[in-house]
Amino acid sequence: MTQARCIRLRSPLWPKRPFNEAYKKLGMLGTGEQKYMPWMQATYLMAANKQALQYLPAGTDLNTITYDQLIEWSKNIAEKTGSPKFGFPAGPKGLKHRFFEGFLYPSYTGSMVTKFRSAEAETAWNKFKELWQYTNPNSTNYAFMQEPLLSGEVWVAFDHVARLADAFNKKPDDFVAFPAPAGPAGRGFMPVVAGVAIPKTSPDMDKAKALVAYMLKPETQIATLKATNFFPVLDVKLPDDMPASVKAFGPAIATMTAAPDARPALLPMGLGDLGGKFNQVYTDSFERIVLGGEDVHGVLGEEAAALKAIIDQSKAPCWAPDKPSAGACPVD
């Protein structure tokens, strides 16, 4: 459904309480009007064993951590314990491509597509190569980071909340959750946002608006969280009977998404059945640069050509964090 076919949603439809402004802006769909209202969210987070906290670099706040601080922290842990304990889901079924698309690239380039082979992108990959020195080598087998966290193989990890939850539910006193790191361009993160819009052809506009207002009530958002593990986009107080993972993730998600340097990156869109090939470009870049040790500049030049071919074939316009485009999203 295009934005031209949806009515403008106005403020009386949602409660007068803090609302995620970054998501509201995304819901304008490139227009000056609220066409789509974010409703619930899931995302990816960082998790750490509390044993790792003693090795944090001086002055580091987990809620505002940067990639440089994460690298220094991981180095400290490796040197003090004698083994690398950062963990990354780089296995065949891991969600590594989402990290590069939605976290690393936006944090260093402010882009996912257009600046794929930029100087800033080269910096991003070189920073990740630094981090990889202190990453558990078994990471190339990991899919769900909750497992190596529980076993103690890994002390600090990145993954989707659904793939971290078991660790927090089984050993709630052992772990902390915190936002993804920030880079020079902001705190890139990839939300999975469910939302609502009202088409102009709705047969009963009043009932449609009433449904939107109901779905955005705090109590409705809490009920949805219990049923689906998708988190509210409103600032709501969670009840005491929630699972340990929800209690840990809720504040971390709220902090990350409302951060002043937040840079949300949407899931790739408009690619049709080429989505898998799009993801493969980021996976191939990781395998060639980080695992294979190939030249960063050369790899990005070659992979950018593959990325451009996919975008041109699908004619997909840009999505956040890239600026809207009239035609296929450019790859500079």
Predicted feature residues:
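Extracytoplasmic "Venus flytrap"/periplasmic binding protein-like
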Residues: 1-22, 54-57, 155-156, 166, ...
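Hinge/lid segment of periplasmic solute-binding proteins
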Residues: 1-43, 69-71, 176-178
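Extracytoplasmic/periplasmic solute-binding protein
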Residues: 30-44, 68-114, 120, 154-155
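Short helix-initiation/N-cap motifs at beta->coil->alpha
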Residues: 65-69, 138-150
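Glycine-centered hinge/linker elements that transmit conformational signals in sensory
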Residues: 72-77, 113-141, 180
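Extracytoplasmic/periplasmic substrate-recognition and gating elements
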Residues: 129-136, 169-232, 266, 284
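Paired acidic/hydrophobic, glycine-rich loop segments that form the ligand-binding mouth/hinge
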Residues: 155-160, 176
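Long, aromatic- and glycine/proline-rich binding clefts that accommodate carbohydrate-like moieties
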Residues: 227-288, 316-332
